[in-house]
Amino acid sequence: MHERARLHGQLTPILRRLAAGILAAWLAAAVADEPPASALGAQVMQTSTKRPRIGLVLGGGGAKGAAHIGIIKVLEEMRVPIDCIAGTSMGSIVGAAYATGLSAAELEKLMTGVNWLDTLASAPRQEIPLHRKSRDFLFPKGLEFGWKDGKLVAPGGLVPTHQIEDLFRRIVAGAAQVPDFDHLPIPFRAVATDLESGEMVVFDRGELAVAMRASMAVPAAFAPVEANGRLLVDGMLVRNLPVDVARNTCADVVIAVQVAAPAATREQLASFLGVAGQAMNIAVAANERAQVATLTDRDVRIRVVLEDVSSADFSKVPETIPIGEAAARAAAASLARYSLSAAAYAEWRADLDKLAAPPKLPIDEIRVTGLRATSPDVVRAQLESKPGDVYDPAKARADADRLVARGDYTAVSYGIASERAGVNVLAFNATEKPWGPEYVNFDLNLSTDFKGDTQWGIRLDYEKRWINSLGGEFRSSVQLGSPNAFAAQFYQPLDVAQRFFVAPVVYANQRLSYLYHGDDALGQYDTRRVGASLDVGAALAPWGEVRLGILREDVDAKPKTGDVLLPDPGRHALGALAARFAYDSVDKALFPTEGVRATASAYSFKPWLGSDRQYETVAFDGTATKTWQKNVWQLTLRGGSDLGSHAPFYDQFRAGGLFNFSGYRYEQLVGREFFLTSVLYRRRAVFLNETLGTAIYSGVSLEVGNVYRRLDGTSASGVLFGGALFLAVDSKVGPIYLAYGRSEGGHSALYLYLGSSIELYQR
């Protein structure tokens, strides 16, 4: 019990990260591959012949399936013993956990403590290599397509699965050394569907967490699971209520728990999503009815109806458990036939095989399997687990998370096995993305201040990874709109640990900018840049890197409209030495709740590098984010200077726009020096759709700073105060902001932002 309590104490904070959209499903079950009726577990074989053997059948139902915990609570109260369990989808998750020896109280604590929304997210962003993190800002929707044979390839599922499977692995950690499900404290079966043949697949052995993942792999929501040469999805499609599976496992008597929802109304069927959902419900109900028809008077059927909980409402899991309890109590008379005396029930509980804590085994070998495009040497260099160490599941889990965060795998499983006498192998099995290693991304962004200044862009990004054994990758991006831009980079690690790298870059952009004198827009000027750079750098960790480089650039700036007098128009050649540092530990790109993101840069433009001007610039931009309860606070510090070297107007610092001197128009303030300090507060106001992870935030920012030595010659001294009020939506189509900004001197603006406002390439 102490070991179990310790285990659950470790599990609880991680369990907060499971899946909000975990399914969008209605779970059913399958049609073939049934185990022989003789496949009885060792524990079942020892069951007293004085009573019938009881099989518990837990049907699918997504979030509604958490009601099974309430059923189990009543079974324990009434002292009804369970000799085997068969489950589908959510029923397999609850059933597997109970089969490993967890009590109903422990199950309730675990399931209600899970943060389902976070668990459906990708691996922790903090572990993503820094050179890949910029994609999160440019393409915030999180959708990624592959490119194979000249065609777009969509991912196998919309929801990442690594954290889900890893959660299951930790829930049933005690079963890691139990490959035969008959040897669990309560023999167990999980039902899945063979996606190719449509047959039912019954898991009676293997890795329990994989069986759970396969049983709840809702098509399209989650990628199929490849196991034993089969491509598997949710068991709901063929056997949502696996009564026959329980009978073939052990059951003389079946307690079948069916999770149901009220019939759909005409209004709910008005959309294509409603129609698709109802079509699935009809198919699931048909295979359920076939199983219900096999129940006899000796069996007990418990039907749990949840009026206001959908299959995807994981935030309502705590509400489902009392409903399950009520349904079980309504069947108390039928259940009472199988109730044991207090002494007999205590004896049954005591006789259950207890899962011993996994032994502390030394690691003799480390093996990585499942690799096709990626390099085993590079992968092994990322692992903290080493031969000679004592196996540490937490360290192995961190290794797996780190590998998945790199972006090449959908999931990485891990575990230790004794393949030969006295030889313990720590095996990592990586599932490479079937749609990789070439990727394509799209994005659309739009911003306006409703005063005629509108920025927009359509972005396309192509990336090819693992060009060579050290992990070289090529990436090119193009944007049409304002500005028009193109950038291409070849990122080449120099060692298997990928600590050092070289990165040649070519880029070009063209943009129209307003030239202001005070508050008056005099007209527009056109700036075109074409350049190339070569960086050498060191990756400090996933959170940071330093780069030293050299660049050459041609700039052509000329008036476009209005009465624009530029101080030095025309074409200019630039050449510079560059030093840059970047740090990024935020948990989310555009709506972070924790972490720090900062960049610092220094450029020295020299005639001997081909520059027709000599000057220097230094800049810093950093934001720290902290969450207290539901309140998110962000502190931002920005600043830059030309160190008195008189930088030309096209390389001076620009400010103005939302959260960047809110109240001023976009890039209204241009000068050779600036600083800005701001404090931003936001709070989630509404959860729009937990499955998609969308929410509405309200917030406020307070800003202080100024731009000095301005291009327009206006005087600037002291500091300017300002701020903004905003509503923001974190949606699958990207961030959406509606805001009102005001700054000292009566400057105000109304803003609408759709998508990412981050520029495609910034040197």
Residue ranges and their predicted role:
Residues 394, 411-579, 586, 653-659, ...:
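Gram-negative/organellar outer-membrane beta-barrel architecture
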Residues 103, 112, 193-196, 206-208, ...:
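Solvent-exposed coil/turn segments that connect beta secondary-structure elements
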Residues 52-54, 78, 184-188, 208, ...:
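Envelope-exposed proteins and targeting segments
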Residues 19-31:
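Hydrophobic helical h-region of N-terminal Sec-dependent signal peptides
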Residues 2-19:
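Bacterial N-terminal signal peptides that target proteins for export
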Residues 425-427, 439-449, 563-570, 574-696, ...:
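C-terminal outer-membrane beta-barrel translocator/porin domains of Gram-negative envelope proteins
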Residues 2, 32-88, 96-401, 405-412, ...:
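Patatin-like phospholipase
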